Amino acid sequence: MKKFINDPFDFVEELTEGIIHAHPDYYRAENGDLRVIVRQDAPVKGKVAIATGGGSGHLPVFMGYVGKGLADGACIGNVFSSPSAGQMKRVTKAIDSGAGVLYLYGRYQGDMMNFNSAAEESKQNGIQVETVVVSDDIASAPPEKHDERRGVAGIFFAYKIAGAMADEMASLDEVKRVTQKAVDNTRSLGVALGPCTIPLVGKPNFEISDDEMEIGMGIHGEQGVERVKMRTADEIAANLVDRVVNDMPFVAGDEVAVLV
């Protein structure tokens, strides 16, 4: 796969630096750290702050959802790799106004380990921290193990809900409660057509034939639930929607928000 790229080791810093230069009114790198990105006006007085983060390679997540009505800060790891606990602590300190910080991120082992470590140390330093972990990917675990599922595109709704509640100056407990309710009612499912190439690896992260697709593959190339021959757009949409609907206890009259 051909790329416009300089040194792969500089990829993440050049990426975040470019976005900051393009949007200087929205972002800043905290103390010059291009892995610790916060909204330009952080901390916002009296408001619960939303902290997020994860590996690079998923734009616009995570940095793209830092801003008014969304997250207040994000820590950025290498491509498909978790940011460090130290970066998470620096984000937490930079955005906390005294009203507390909600950690909001997808369920991946490395992210959970480092965010949990950052939360404990931040609490020891006098910052209130609560956590909501997004777990919307129905392909990664059965319904009875919803809280073990991976967090993927459904985090968009969590950002919007948490950000809106925080902007209304709700308490940390209330922001957490409403955001958790949104996460509990979010489902997603994806389909993969081809691999990506991680800059530092230099080769595709999985193999799939040109005439195949894989339903439910994870965003890092984790095995999905079914590999089949390519289908039409209508057939793919029907397949995904049926699986999502069957995973939720819908009743007549329910209203849903849809993200494609």
Model-flagged regions — what are they?
Residues 203-236, 240-260:
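Glycine-rich phosphate/diphosphate-binding loops and the adjacent beta-loop-alpha structural elements
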Residues 1-50, 210:
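N-terminal amphipathic/basic leader segments beginning at the initiator methionine
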Residues 74-79, 123-148:
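Short, acidic/small-residue loops that bind anionic groups at enzyme active sites
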Residues 23-34, 169-178, 188-198, 246-257:
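Flexible, glycine/charged-enriched surface loops at secondary-structure junctions
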Residues 45-53, 62-75, 139-142, 213-229, ...:
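Gly-rich Lys/Arg/Thr-decorated short loops/hinges at beta-loop-alpha junctions or inter-strand turns
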Residues 140-149, 159-220:
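Internal, active-site/partner-interface "lid" segment
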Residues 58, 67-98, 245:
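Glycine-rich oxoanion-binding loops at beta->alpha junctions
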Residues 2, 48-55, 71-74, 100-109, ...:
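Short glycine-rich or small-residue beta-strand-to-loop segments that form or flank ligand, phosphate
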